[in-house]
Amino acid sequence: MGNWGVGISQSDTYCETYERFIEEYDKGKPVSQITQDILAEWLEEFEEDDGVLHDVFFALGKAEWLCGGISESIFNRINEIIKNGKDIAYWQELSATPSDLKQRQKALQTFLNSISTSKATAKKEKFPRITILQNQVHHSYLCQK
């Protein structure tokens, strides 16, 4: 997995996690179940304090916030990662430049501020559309688009 910028969403891990969350949400799966399933998969591969998981928690936090409200456990974990400097320390291990670290810290604070306020409306699920097609023999088929 890689990062291509200092922004919160500028990593493969973040994008993969966020997209998976939204796909499951759009299928009607409960937010808490999606979060639990995604975390379980990542925790099979990485230790809970591994820096790779920071982007997983950030993506889950953003997705939960967007879909109606961030859970207390995810918010507290994100807050801990940011306030205790864990993400910046992880980026230092990755040999980030001082300029990148400063920009990352600013991005982290902006992100934390944004998820700290409640969102007025939750994202609506986008269920797959179903259309009925008829062939020449007048049999009906259901198709998902």
Give the positions of each predicted feature.
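Amphipathic alpha-helical elements of HEAT/ARM-like alpha-solenoid repeat scaffolds that form extended
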Residues: 2, 16-17, 51-66, 98, ...
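Structural motif
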Residues: 131-139
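Amphipathic alpha-helical binding modules
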Residues: 80-132
